[in-house]
Design a protein with these regions (language model features):
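Histidine-anchored nucleotide/phosphate-binding helix
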Residues: 10-30
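A glycine-rich helix N-cap at a beta->alpha junction
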Residues: 45-70
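Hydrophobic anchor at the start of a short beta-strand
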Residues: 2, 27-28, 53
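Short, glycine-rich nucleotide/cofactor-binding loops
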Residues: 2-15, 34
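Short beta-alpha junction loops
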Residues: 34-38, 58-60
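C-terminal structural segments of small proteins and small subunits
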Residues: 65-95
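Short, T/G/N/S-enriched strand-turn elements that build extracellular solenoid repeat scaffolds
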Residues: 19, 41-45
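Short, well-ordered alpha-helix to beta-strand connector turns
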Residues: 25, 50-51, 88-90
Length: 95
């Protein structure tokens, strides 16, 4: 599995690269933290099944970003992220 961590807003060139790589990948999970949670307000998230998207609830609340149906808004966001990162079968990419 490929794990993507996005901390940039949707129009940032790094975000665009992240979404491009996700489109070309299979078996992926997307973690949204910091300004990355603004991606929940864009259509770009249609590239993944919503249950494969994890958002930091604390960052969403701090920025006033509502959660989309099906997206995992996690209180234990960083714990889940670290568990996925530490699994030796997973590749990790940070943007």
């Amino acid at each position: 599995m490929k794990i993507f961590l996005l901390t940039k807003p949707p129009k940032n060139p790094r975000s665009k690269l992240c979404f491009k790589l996700i489109r070309r990948s299979q078996d992926t999970r997307l973690y949204l933290a910091g300004d990355g949670v603004y991606s929940l307000q864009s259509d770009i998230l249609d590239i993944l099944p919503q249950e494969r998207i994890f958002a930091c609830r604390e960052d969403m609340e701090a920025r006033g970003v509502p959660c989309k149906d099906g997206v995992n808004a996690c209180d234990d966001f960083y714990e889940r992220l670290v568990e996925d990162m530490m699994d030796e079968r997973n590749g990790f990419y940070s943007f």
